[in-house]
């Protein structure tokens, strides 16, 4: 193998056994709910942490896969989706071409 892939380099940064980015989003949301409505919302943090740790137990990239699913299925609404009810993923962006008028 010419260019080996070291699996340790692909692991996300973990805090309390959960990837740092989903943990920050979840704890920030719970903190905002606790500030806006009631301090009792802070009791949801251990429950959310436990749920995230259970999800991560099998695959440490689970939250990345969930984000990709949401981004590709629900957030990516292109022109083909309205007509074909499907989504196309391509590395190229196609622009409409102008028609050239032929001179007689």
Swiss-Prot record:
Induction: Cotranscribed with ptxABCDE. Activated by the two-component regulatory system BvgS/BvgA. Keywords: Cell membrane, Membrane, Transmembrane, Transmembrane helix, Transport. It is found in: Cell membrane. It comes from the Bacteria. The keyword Transmembrane helix applies. InterPro entries: T4SS_VirB3/TrbD/AvhB. It is a single-pass membrane protein. The chain crosses the membrane at residues 30-50. Belongs to the virB3 family. Component of the type IV secretion system ptl required for secretion of assembled pertussis toxin (PTX) through the outer membrane. This is Type IV secretion system protein PtlB.
